[in-house]
Amino acid sequence: MNGLNEHKFKNIVVVAGAGISCGESSLLSLVVASGIPDFRSANGLYRNLNKYPVPYLRDPSTIFDYYDFQEYSTPFWILAKEMFYTNGQYHPTPCHFFLQLLAQKGLLRRVFTQNIDGLERKAGLAPPTLIEGHGTCSQCACVRCKQEYDPNVPQIAVNTRTVPFCSKCGGQIKPSIVFFGEDLPDVFYRCVMKDCPEADLLIVMGTSLQVYPMW
C-alpha cells in the first residue's frame, strides 16, 4: 500500500472476481457488499439454489451451459431475474470505485474481471481498460444469427416472465455472458499476453483464481 501512496506504480493490472461484489475481498477494508451472491463459496449460488424459484436441477452449473440454455432456458431466466435484472437494485462497492480511482489517476493499465454483473461499468470503468473475461449482462445478442439487441431486452423479458426471441431469425436472445461450452473473447487472451509482462504491479481482488482461465 505504501507503494501506491508513493506513486511507485504506474502500470497496474488487476484481476477481479465475485468477492468485490459480494463482500469477500478485504483489500483496504473497502468492501461493502453489493448484495449479489457469488457462485462457489459456502454462501454462494450453487450451494443455495433452493432459495431461488428455480426448477430442480441435478447440477446447478447447467443453468449456465450453452447447449442446455438453447434447449431449456427457463431456469436461467428465473435466476437472472433474481441476480442480474433487478431494475437497478445492485450498486458498485467501494472496491469498484477504487479501481475507477486508479484509472482516473492514470495508474491502471487493465482490469481483467470474472464478473458478469456489470458493476465495473456502473462505477465508470469501460473497455479497453476493462476486459470482461466472462462477458457481461450489459449486452445481449441472438444465439443463432448473433444480431445484437438493446440491453434492456432481457430486463423486459424477466419483468414479463417471457423468453426473448430474435425478430430476425427466431433464435433465443442471450445475455453476452460466457456460458460453459463457449470460448472466451479473443481480446482477453491478447491483452493478457501484452499486459502481464509490462505490468509493474498485479492486484488480485475477490477471486481465488480457481476458475479457468484465471488460474
Identify the function of each model-found stretch:
Residues 1-215:
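Conserved catalytic core of sirtuin-type NAD+-dependent deacylases
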